[in-house]
From Swiss-Prot:
Top-level taxon of the source organism: Bacteria
Name of the featured protein: ATP synthase subunit delta
HAMAP family (UniProt xref): ATP_synth_delta_bact
Recorded name of the encoding gene: atpH
Compartments, as annotated in UniProt: Cell membrane
Subunit organization: F-type ATPases have 2 components, F(1) - the catalytic core - and F(0) - the membrane proton channel. F(1) has five subunits: alpha(3), beta(3), gamma(1), delta(1), epsilon(1). F(0) has three main subunits: a(1), b(2) and c(10-14). The alpha and beta chains form an alternating ring which encloses part of the gamma chain. F(1) is attached to F(0) by a central stalk formed by the gamma and epsilon chains, while a peripheral stalk is formed by the delta and b chains.
Lineage: Bacteria, Bacillati, Actinomycetota, Actinomycetes, Micrococcales
Any one Gene Ontology cellular component term annotated for this protein: plasma membrane
Organism, scientific name: Kocuria rhizophila (strain ATCC 9341 / DSM 348 / NBRC 103217 / DC2201)
Keyword Transport attached: yes
InterPro entries recorded: ATPase_OSCP/d_CS, ATPase_OSCP/dsu
């Protein structure tokens, strides 16, 4: 694919949380279908990544082409991705693919919270491990003569999962790896889901171990703050001096004495 600009490659991203409440496996499936359309149509791909067109114009083009033909959430996501400047023509398809995985993860989250995300990661890694152990299965999925439908049928026979989201991502990886290897793509899918799973884990560092009552109060406070039942992990770090440090996903709450002293030093220029 031709280069759209000389800008360095970076992932196109959207805030999936904007649509998380409405996320379903079907919306993720439609996003994957849109990836296939973009990959297969060079003229469309160039139009949606053309740096001479404004982001608003590219987003309007998405709505013109897809409104009424795909789920409104899927169309809005693709329009927002297309409105961003792409460094390469492939970048848009990559961004839609990644977002499709995150929408599938959000659908699992809606169904079963952090436990469903953990199970989804396990399903993906388990299937990848099965692939790694069997050269025959690898050859079956890499056989260019086999249809996508045949590969999906084989994946359904081999994947022992009751999760619609896991089935979707596994079938996608083996039937449309977009130039990658199915196992490698499954590993990438699992990493994206695992990144989202971090939103359900609170990593707590304290200068001294907390008692059971303190942990219970902290758990309750964090659950109320984030609006979900977090999994708490604790670690003692004497260098904090006092207080505690909590990380949930990429957000950090630092109430340690060390951090407060550092802030004071910054304010006074020490």
């Amino acid at each position: 694919m031709a280069e759209a600009s000389n800008e360095p490659y970076r992932p196109l991203t959207v805030d999936v949380d904007r649509w998380a409440a409405a996320a379903t496996p079907e919306i993720a499936h439609q996003l994957f279908e849109i990836v296939d359309i973009v990959d297969a149509n060079g003229a469309l791909r160039r139009a949606l990544t053309d740096p001479s067109r404004s982001g608003e114009d590219r987003a309007r083009l998405v709505h013109t082409l897809l409104d009424g033909r795909a789920n409104e959430v899927a169309v809005d996501i693709v329009a927002e991705l297309a409105s961003q400047r792409s460094a390469t023509e492939r970048q848009l398809g990559d961004g839609i693919e990644r977002t499709a995985v995150l929408v599938a993860a959000a659908a699992a989250e809606n169904r079963g919270g952090g436990h469903a995300l953990e199970a989804l990661v396990d399903d993906l890694i388990r299937f990848k491990s099965m692939l790694d152990r069997s050269a025959d299965v690898q050859r079956a999925f890499s056989d260019s003569r086999a249809s996508a439908e045949a590969k999906v049928t084989l994946a359904r026979r081999l994947a022992h999962t009751e999760s619609d989201e896991a089935a979707l991502l596994i079938e996608r990886a083996v039937s449309a790896p977009r130039g990658s290897l199915p196992g490698r793509l499954l590993e990438q899918f699992a990493q994206w889901v695992a990144d989202r799973q971090q939103r359900w884990i609170a990593r707590v560092e304290t200068a001294r171990p907390l008692g059971e009552e303190q942990l219970a109060r902290l758990q309750d406070g964090l659950n109320r703050l984030y609006g979900r039942d977090l999994k708490l992990t604790t670690e003692t770090n004497p260098s904090l001096v006092g207080g505690l440090r909590v990380q949930v996903g990429e957000e950090i709450i630092d109430g340690s004495l060390t951090h407060r002293l550092g802030q004071l030093q910054q304010r006074i220029g020490a």
